[in-house]
Amino acid sequence: MAEVSSSTVRRPFHRRRKTCPFSGANAPKIDYKDVRLLQRYISERGKIVPSRITAVSQKKQRELAKAIKRARFLGLLPYVVA
């Protein structure tokens, strides 16, 4: 059998998990009227960016999605960007 030397074995790279931008003392409140904040979590095509990319917690992602949908309904944000 072939022996694997320790110099050729690569250890997997572990990326440090980013913290949620909406948790903490100075965190912004999620509000459907704050269009500038909501636009940071919408893609160029108008889709809601998933939490695995933005590092938003599951609870705050639900709040964010609800606020974006409410702002779209009221005409503050577009549904689709052509």
From Swiss-Prot:
One GO term describing the cellular component: cytosolic small ribosomal subunit
Keywords in alphabetical order: Ribonucleoprotein, Ribosomal protein, RNA-binding, rRNA-binding
Stored InterPro entries: Ribosomal_bS18, Ribosomal_bS18_CS, Ribosomal_bS18_sf
GO biological process assignments: translation
Annotated region (Disordered), positions in chain: 1-20
Domain of life, per lineage: Bacteria
Family designation: Belongs to the bacterial ribosomal protein bS18 family.
Stated role: Binds as a heterodimer with protein bS6 to the central domain of the 16S rRNA, where it helps stabilize the platform of the 30S subunit.
Name this protein carries in UniProt: Small ribosomal subunit protein bS18
Organism: Allorhizobium ampelinum (strain ATCC BAA-846 / DSM 112012 / S4)
